[in-house]
């Protein structure tokens, strides 16, 4: 999971207790985890530091994840009713998207 919000990290770890959950809070740590573990599924927030209010860092992270391990299924998690950027992420290669606030049952179904 690539998420900079510690509260949401905890919620998602709790939601996916049946899975091995790796946590990254920014692009550098996400790419390091990806190289080390090559997870089949990545949940990724589009609003990542240093551009936590925008999506440029999240989109760049998505592109790099897919370039490194193209088979990875990336599910982008967006906030603020940002469906336009979620659709853009799917066009880049994201597997699916989910809008915050997170409903854990629905997110488990997507994964």
Q: Where do the protein language model's features map onto the residues?
A:
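Alpha2 helix of the CheY-like receiver
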Residues: 28-35, 63, 108
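Short, conserved "switch-loop" micro-motifs in signal-transduction and mechanochemical regulators
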Residues: 80-81, 92
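Active-site T/S-Asp motif of two-component receiver
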Residues: 44-45, 49
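Two-component/phosphorelay signaling modules centered on CheY-like receiver
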Residues: 5-28, 36, 41
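C-terminal output helix
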Residues: 84, 98-111
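Short amphipathic alpha-helix used as the core "switch/output" element in two-component signaling
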Residues: 32, 52-71, 88
């Amino acid at each position: 999971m690539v998420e900079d919000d510690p509260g949401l990290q905890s919620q998602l770890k709790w939601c996916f207790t049946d899975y091995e959950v790796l946590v990254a809070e920014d692009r550098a740590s996400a790419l390091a985890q990806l190289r080390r573990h090559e997870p089949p599924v990545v949940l990724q927030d589009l609003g990542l530091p240093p551009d936590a209010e925008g999506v440029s860092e999240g989109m760049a992270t998505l592109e790099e994840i897919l370039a490194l391990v193209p088979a990875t299924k990336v599910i982008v998690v967006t906030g603020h009713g940002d469906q336009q950027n979620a659709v853009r992420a799917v066009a880049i290669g994201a597997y699916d998207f989910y809008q915050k606030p997170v409903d854990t049952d629905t997110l488990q179904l997507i994964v």
